[in-house]
Each structure stands twice: as C-alpha cells, then as structure tokens.
From Swiss-Prot:
Upper taxonomic lineage: Eukaryota, Metazoa, Chordata, Craniata, Vertebrata
PTM entry text: The N-terminal processed form GRO-beta(5-73) is produced by proteolytic cleavage after secretion from bone marrow stromal cells.
Localization per Swiss-Prot or TrEMBL: Secreted
Entry's Gene Ontology molecular function annotations: chemokine activity
Listed name of the protein: C-X-C motif chemokine 2
Protein's gene: CXCL2
Stretch forming the signal peptide: 1-34
Length: 107
C-alpha cells in the first residue's frame, strides 16, 4: 500500500493565485453588500422642527453640507434618547446652538 504524502506548499502556484483572487473577490463583494449605503448617501433630516425646549435637549450635532446632503443639518439628541432634526435657519435653533456650544454639550 502506497502512502499519500501531504505537502505544505501547493503543487500548482497558478491554482493558488486563482483561489486567492476568488477569496478576495468574495470578501470584497460581501463587504459591499453589507455596507449601509442608504444612510450615507442622503440627508438624515427630511423634516425639521422650528425649535424645542432647551431643558429637553441632551446634546446637539451640527452636520455641515457635503456629498451626502447639500444642506446643514442640526440633530438634537433629547434626554429621553430620541433624536429630533431642527431647522438651522430658525432663530430659536440658532439660540439653542449658541447655548449648547457655551455649555459644551454639542458634538
């Protein structure tokens, strides 16, 4: 009975290259399929509020215009955990942002 020997290195380097290329393609396609594109390629604020009482706000995040959205977005995180989009042009929202910046509660 002849014994089969196992070699640590593959006997066909071309087969190894093809297998590695296939592995890379599969890994890249799975990453692309799992990427959250919908939230990255559009504005987060579809509707805005003119203002909200300052005592209900935990923090404020101001997102500058960019490739994902052409407008400035102001997103307030409320003390109850909800998020609310505020109108950045509203005088009340401008005052809220100033107070939050002064208190150090903005992102």
């Amino acid at each position: 009975m002849a014994r089969a020997t196992l070699s640590a290195a593959p006997s066909n380097p071309r087969l190894l290259r093809v297998a590695l290329l296939l592995l890379l393609l599969v890994a890249a396609s799975r990453r692309a399929a799992g990427a959250p594109l919908a939230t990255e390629l559009r504005c987060q604020c579809l509707q805005t509020l003119q203002g909200i009482h300052l005592k209900n706000i935990q923090s404020v995040k101001v997102k500058s215009p960019g490739p994902h959205c052409a407008q400035t977005e102001v997103i307030a995180t409320l003390k109850n955990g909800q998020k609310a989009c505020l109108n950045p042009a509203s005088p009340m929202v401008k005052k809220i942002i100033e107070k939050m910046l002064k208190n150090g509660k903005s992102n």
